[in-house]
Amino acid sequence: GLSIFKTSKRTYTGSLLATEDTKLEYLSQYIDVSILKAVAETITTMLSALLLNKYVGPLGIDMMLVKQEGTNNLAIHPCVEINLRRTMGHVALSLSPSPLEPQRLMSIDHSRGAYHLRLHTLNDGLLNTSIARL
């Protein structure tokens, strides 16, 4: 599934918790989601062949939207890194709401020598919320 997340200084800081349809709707503001779906299918096919009989387990692929040089358009960077392990994206997916539950933000901060996971309910819905507020 999709995980829309934010980082600060190359460190994961939080995720949007919403249904897959809502996340696709959110991303459609920035990119053509049919391209995202095609990229996901291609990566799935390629990794299935590459990892056959070599790895069984969870994995996550970090993608990113990047500004195209000289324009205000965004493009998909299809593979920043592949994590052959459980990721914070898996945690976000397991905490994502059903279509009948409110959308949330999951954030992680570090204070007083410990990490803290927090869930914030969105009253106005994900599509009206800036990802920058994570």
Locations of regions flagged by a protein language model:
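Active-site capping/gating regions of soluble enzymes
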Residues: 64, 82-83
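C-terminal active-site "lid" helix and adjoining low-complexity regulatory extension at the edge
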Residues: 73-75, 84-134
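A long amphipathic alpha-helix within ATP-dependent nucleotide-binding catalytic cores
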Residues: 13-74, 113-128
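Residues in well-ordered beta-strands of folded domains
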Residues: 3, 62-64, 133
